[in-house]
């Protein structure tokens, strides 16, 4: 309930309002959660779990925050465990765990649509569709859900189109532009 009451653009930004949690915005779509006072743009300190599954990118060996996470429409609850949790979650949980639980299609079927517009030409939309099927006796036998998200924005704009000159001179000792 504390996250829902925060004046933030999305639930992920709302986590930063919780005690002991810092959020670093590496870009518009990539947020890094840090706990225990270790603030860094590298998200290697916290373990992120979605429905009991580690959300690490195999090639990078760290979670990409909500860049590859669940849609905001599909989140049922988020638990943040601060501190070392290696005894329960393994060696990657030395600085805390972010555990997200998504909505069960058996419990919450239906259609949800969300549109967001904002500065930096932000356009974001999400769609969640879930349906359950019952047998002749009225018992639930199968359910599925589909989540689609799209975000488009200008994170930054390159306005210096001049060629880079890497020559070393007295007014440019490092050879940088």
Predicted regions and their residues:
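Extracytoplasmic beta-strand/coil segments of soluble accessory domains associated
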Residues: 12-54, 76-77
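Outer-membrane beta-barrel translocator/receptor signature
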Residues: 57-60, 73-76, 87-171
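Short, polar/charged loop or turn motifs at beta-strand boundaries
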Residues: 1-8, 34-38, 115-119
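Flexible glycine-/small-residue-rich
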Residues: 37-39, 50-52, 82, 102-104, ...
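Short beta-strands and strand-coil junctions in structured, solvent-facing domains, enriched
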Residues: 4, 21-23, 41, 55-57, ...
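Flexible glycine-rich, low-complexity coil/linker segments exposed to the extracellular/periplasmic environment
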Residues: 174-177
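A general structural signal for stabilizing positions within well-ordered secondary structure
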Residues: 12-15, 69, 88, 136
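Short acidic/polar hinge/loop motifs at secondary-structure boundaries
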Residues: 54-82
């Amino acid at each position: 309930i504390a996250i829902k009451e925060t004046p933030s653009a999305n639930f992920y930004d709302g986590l930063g309002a919780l005690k002991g949690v810092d959020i670093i915005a590496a870009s518009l779509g990539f947020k890094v959660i840090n706990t225990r006072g270790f603030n860094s743009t590298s998200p290697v300190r916290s373990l992120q779990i979605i429905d009991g599954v580690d959300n690490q990118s195999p090639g990078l060996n760290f979670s990409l925050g909500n860049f590859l996470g669940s849609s905001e429409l599909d989140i049922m609850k988020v638990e943040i465990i601060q501190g070392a949790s290696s005894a329960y979650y393994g060696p990657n949980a030395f600085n805390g765990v972010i555990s997200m639980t998504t909505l069960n299609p058996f419990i919450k079927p239906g259609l949800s649509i969300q549109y967001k517009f904002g500065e930096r030409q932000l356009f974001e939309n999400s769609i969640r569709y879930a349906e359950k099927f019952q047998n002749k006796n009225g018992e639930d036998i199968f359910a599925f859900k589909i989540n689609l998200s799209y975000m488009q924005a200008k994170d930054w704009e390159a306005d210096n189109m001049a060629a880079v000159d890497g020559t070393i001179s007295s007014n440019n000792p490092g050879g940088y532009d």
